[in-house]
């Protein structure tokens, strides 16, 4: 009899074998992790993550909890996440932290290193679990070696979270596909940024055609032309410093979508400090692209504003992992996810890979957390292929190194931020004169 991974009472007690589930998770996890060069790690993590379900106690537990055999006795400890972690450590002793930390925490969250070591030391591999042979060791070493050329010590915890994100989302998605096929069917492929660009182009052309020939509109057009001209630049850090009234929202969106098209990037994530601005920005985006193509993920989302029940369900599901072409969220949601250890928040991280991040009103980034925020953005740009666009009316100092007499005053910024609007444009003076 095959090892049970899931039982679906709604489908006449259908059983998903642990082999099918593990293979499904491995396939998805490998696909996600391949985006940043660690596909083999994703595959092995997926194959090992539920090895503990082979335990006799777990098989009894799942039969009882599902209702298949409600009166069956459970003999002993039925926890399972630690088993795959111990197997990973045994099979891959030198590189196991990039597997075992994700596996042992795939339900309860990532442990810090001390707690991880303590938890691992409490257990042994159960005798009723089969330990497979080690495979793909050389491939994993090669993947890690390529990344290590650019990694610094502070980058590794983000790499751990990213691998964790791949495993957690893959586990959720494969389980959902078996337990709730109707919901899973809503996760069909979304429209791409390439397909969305004509909508933006048409919208901007209509505005231009109807707009009177005024000084303000000429400045806005000038800003947009600069965004078009610089959008083909390499992935990296950019800033768009445009005073209020200069058309910053549409210009930044134009730059982001063209930059994404240039580099084959998958999505645009717009992070905004205030929910009032988010609602306004999202409304503009929906008028351009359609509400079905813009995901709002913040506390002020009004479900009643979405009349289509199917679309509402799709949006709720997409907010779990940000698998959407355009995401509008808060700074808090973005940075809490990047620095969290919880499955629900980390789940979306792998969908930030190869994305354009627009940080609106960059001057509002909290001073007390500015160093870890900047360090995180540098890691995501270097290791995970993102580009970051800071937009503001008055750009804060985020580049270079600032040294003070107090250690807390020391700030290591971004080496280079490419300003889209040259100083000679003097937009502040021009807009001040025409108001």
Range-by-range predicted roles:
Residues 2-203:
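Accessory nucleic-acid engagement/destabilization modules that flank
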Residues 15, 21, 28, 40, ...:
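Conserved pre-motif I regulatory segment
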Residues 103, 234-259:
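Walker A/P-loop
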Residues 233-240, 266-267, 323-324, 432:
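Pre-Walker A (Motif I) flank of P-loop NTPase domains
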Residues 251, 256-258, 264-289, 296-301, ...:
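Conserved Walker A/P-loop ATP-binding site and its immediately adjacent core
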Residues 290-339:
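Inter-Walker segment of RecA-like/P-loop motor cores
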Residues 394-435:
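Interdomain hinge/linker at the junction between the two RecA-like core domains of SF2 helicases
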């Amino acid at each position: 009899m095959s090892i049970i991974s899931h039982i679906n009472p709604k489908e006449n007690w259908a059983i998903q074998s642990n082999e099918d589930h593990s293979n499904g998770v491995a396939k998805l996890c490998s696909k996600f992790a391949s985006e940043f060069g660690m596909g083999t790690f994703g595959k092995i993590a997926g194959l090992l993550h539920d090895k503990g379900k082979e335990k006799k106690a777990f098989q009894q537990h799942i039969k009882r909890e599902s209702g298949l055999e409600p009166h069956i006795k459970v003999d002993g400890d039925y926890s399972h996440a630690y088993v795959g972690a111990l197997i990973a450590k045994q099979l891959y002793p030198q590189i196991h932290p990039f597997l075992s930390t994700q596996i042992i925490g795939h339900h309860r969250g990532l442990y810090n290193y001390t707690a991880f070591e303590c938890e691992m030391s409490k257990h042994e591999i159960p005798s009723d679990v089969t330990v497979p042979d080690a495979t793909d060791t050389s491939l994993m070493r090669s993947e890690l070696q390529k990344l290590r050329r650019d990694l610094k010590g502070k980058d590794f915890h983000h790499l751990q979270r990213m691998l964790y994100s791949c495993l957690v989302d893959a586990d959720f998605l494969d389980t959902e596909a078996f337990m709730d096929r109707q919901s899973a069917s809503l996760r069909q492929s979304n429209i791409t940024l390439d397909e969305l660009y004509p909508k933006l182009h048409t919208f901007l052309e209509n505005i231009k055609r109807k707009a009177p020939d005024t000084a303000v509109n000429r400045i806005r057009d000038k800003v947009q032309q600069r965004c078009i001209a610089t959008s083909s630049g390499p992935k990296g850090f950019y800033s768009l410093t445009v005073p209020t009234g200069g058309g910053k929202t549409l210009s930044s969106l134009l730059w982001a979508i063209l930059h994404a098209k240039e580099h084959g990037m998958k999505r645009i994530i717009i992070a905004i400090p205030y929910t009032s601005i988010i609602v306004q920005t999202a409304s503009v985006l929906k008028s351009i692209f359609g509400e079905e193509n813009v995901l709002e993920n913040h506390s002020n989302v009004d479900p009643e504003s979405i009349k289509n029940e199917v679309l509402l369900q799709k949006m709720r599901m997409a907010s779990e992992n940000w698998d959407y072409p355009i995401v509008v969220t808060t700074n808090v949601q973005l940075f809490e996810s990047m620095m969290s250890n919880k499955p629900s928040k980390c789940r979306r991280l792998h969908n930030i890979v190869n994305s354009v991040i627009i940080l609106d009103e960059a001057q509002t980034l909290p001073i007390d957390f500015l160093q870890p925020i900047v360090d995180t953005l540098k890691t995501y740009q270097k290791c995970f292929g993102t580009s970051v666009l800071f937009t503001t009316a008055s750009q804060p100092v985020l580049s270079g190194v600032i040294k003070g007499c107090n250690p807390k005053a020391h700030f290591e910024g971004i080496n280079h931020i490419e300003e889209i609007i040259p100083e000679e444009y003097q937009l502040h003076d021009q807009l001040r004169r025409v108001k």
